[in-house]
Amino acid sequence: MARDFPLERVRNIGIAAHIDAGKTTTTERILFYSGVVHKIGEVHDGAAVTDWMAQERERGITITAAAISTSWQDHRINIIDTPGHVDFTIEVERSMRVLDGVIAVFCAVGGVQPQSETVWRQADRYSVPRMVFVNKMDRTGADFLKVNKQIKDRLKANALPIQLPIGAEGDLTGIIDLVANKAYLYKNDLGTDIEEAPIPSEMEEEAAEWRYKLMESVAENDEELIEIFLETGELSEEQLKKGIREGVLKHGLVPVLCGSAFKNKGVQLVLDAVVDYLPAPVDVKPIQGVLPSGKEDVRPSDDNAPFSALAFKVMSDPYGKLTFVRMYSGVLSKGSYVMNSTKDAKERISRLVILKADEREEVDELRAGDLGAVLGLKNTTTGDTLCNTDDPIVLETLFIPEPVISVAVEPKTKGDMEKLSKALTALSEEDPTFRVSTDPETNQTVIAGMGELHLEILVDRMLREFKVEANIGAPQVSYRETIRSSSKGEGKYARQTGGKGQYGHVIIEMEPAEVGKGFEFVNKIVGGAVPKEYIGPASNGMKETCESGVLAGYPLIDVKVTLVDGSFHDVDSSEMAFKIAGSMAFKDGVKKCNPVLLEPMMKVEVESPDDFLGSVIGDLSSRRGQVEGQSVDDGLSKVQAKVPLAEMFGYATQLRSMTQGRGIFSMEFANYEEVPRNVAEAIISKNQGNS
């Protein structure tokens, strides 16, 4: 089957921004003008094509990155609409990994918001070329040039207006195209009747000034253009387009456009700019990967190269499991067998589809540069590489942040236990930042995610999609106990009941073990003081006592026990008697070994604008945190600290409020450390029921 569009005429783009900048409305208008939908869907009416989950339509926010294919000016445009809420960062992250270009949408009133900075950093991480659409120019307080300055100052971007608005707020009547040096005037509400006109006389001077700046900036990056510009003081429309495209692809130039998606103004010009300035798959660097030999290799965007693709999203739906893939090289055919090189597993491709949000079109094959979805994959999860069995390669994977909040979950009825388990498995397959584990001590199921809204929506999905009602508990900290000194312990169990008695007797030495050893047992019995068959039961008795600790009922770790002596009775001794004696000796010894309470310490890294550095450090210190490092780079501060997990609950919300939503943090387990005496006393007292 031949290609519908040559690779040079394919654009894989994302639409990304902060909440309420108008991303989804912009996507809806793009679909309307490019003919995918025939009626405009509004986010606030709950009718947007890309917001296809029930929760998205209710809340008016985009949660999952919906992938849609459309066409414009004889180009195929694959679009991903991404969420702006920080709890759904993984959706933006995985979009950036597979895109070639991004339209960053900003509100003309709100300008650069905290989430804009996060999204911009994610685009930087994957070196994604981008352009800007300053939306909502019809709103009171809209200021195009102010937003352009914020993008330059706060995002350190080489932002360059290629348009100017004619009028603003309720009086936005048209747009000046600085590249073509003319105006577009809107004659109807649908934005379909557009008149080309000369630049209005009252704006000629301002437009000439901005066009000169545009020519100057574009010429700076191109030797050929700078010569022409220095000689003639002018660049033609074609020369400007070529220069802007080169600047976007290579030099970090960011063209800035304006309009109002809601009022249907400026969207077709955004589509023109996508075609003119954003890269095709052949314009970006070939994807890198690692061969089985360990050698690095690249795969060019070419149908004739060996097949390789990256799974960037897994979704359950009524028809089965959909795995979204970005094709990097070669051709993937329906019914073929491929290799999951990340997991070293063979997979069969049952069906292939291209998505138009919640509608789908079945296709026989996907080619290099395509975004599509596969049905039938059993073992593939987010970040896995698919390739030919004859030409294995593992592509660079996604950066997946660690979850930062966890809570216990249980079904409201016993009968829902199995349904809950299935729901959690399906949801964790879809979302790599959603983790499920079982607490061995409480036997509770614990779910972890990127924030409270993240977990709230997942619990909501359990109810809607899997019909499971669940209770959510407060998160618990898993403390531990250990000993700080050495001692001896003795346990003698002697009972006489009727005929046969019970007798077991052991003497042990206890000392702290190396960190990470858990429970270590050494047998030093000589001369048969304790027969061999009773040594195992005595050790088991000690190990079981270890599990419930001596201070507050938490497991005892890193303890070394040496069995040195004991005695037995030919008739009355038994395995049970020695198990009880072992437990008694352990309890006797541990009390004399200075037992202490340990708590999990977390490695925490906080990123925020440097204005908030003092507040961030002060807050971490108030949480018993130890700051281990800090740096400031380009107005962004990073703080590394070690903080007790018990003090980190509610931190995501506190950080947001403290940094006006502009701070992000990651957290992972570091080690166990001793709990300060005053804190330990409160925990012990509470667990012993004295509080």
From Swiss-Prot:
Q: Which InterPro entries match?
A: EFG_II (IPR041095), EFG_III (IPR009022), EFG_III/V (IPR035647), EFG_IV (IPR047872), EFG_V (IPR035649), EFG_V-like (IPR000640), EFTu-like_2 (IPR004161), G_TR_CS (IPR031157)
Q: Which GO terms describe its molecular function?
A: GTP binding; GTPase activity; translation elongation factor activity
Q: Which residues bind GTP?
A: 17-24, 81-85, 135-138
The alphabetical list of record keywords is: Cytoplasm, Elongation factor, GTP-binding, Nucleotide-binding, Protein biosynthesis
UniProt superkingdom: Bacteria
User: Would you kindly state one Gene Ontology biological process term found in this protein's UniProt entry?
Assistant: ribosome disassembly
Main subcellular localization, coarse class?
cytoplasm
All residue ranges annotated as the tr-type G domain in the record: 8-282
Which Pfam family is one of this chain's hits? EFG_III
Q: Which SUPFAM superfamilies match?
A: EF-G C-terminal domain-like, P-loop containing nucleoside triphosphate hydrolases, Ribosomal protein S5 domain 2-like, Translation proteins
**One term under GO cellular component:** cytoplasm
Tell where it localizes: Cytoplasm
Which cysteines link up through disulfide bonds?
none
HAMAP family recorded for this chain? EF_G_EF_2_B
Q: What family is this protein classified in?
A: Belongs to the TRAFAC class translation factor GTPase superfamily. Classic translation factor GTPase family. EF-G/EF-2 subfamily.
Described purpose of this protein according to its UniProt entry: Catalyzes the GTP-dependent ribosomal translocation step during translation elongation. During this step, the ribosome changes from the pre-translocational (PRE) to the post-translocational (POST) state as the newly formed A-site-bound peptidyl-tRNA and P-site-bound deacylated tRNA move to the P and E sites, respectively. Catalyzes the coordinated movement of the two tRNA molecules, the mRNA and conformational changes in the ribosome.
Query: What protein is this chain from?
Result: Elongation factor G
Q: Which organism is it from?
A: Prochlorococcus marinus (strain MIT 9215)
In the UniProt record, what gene is named as encoding this protein?
fusA
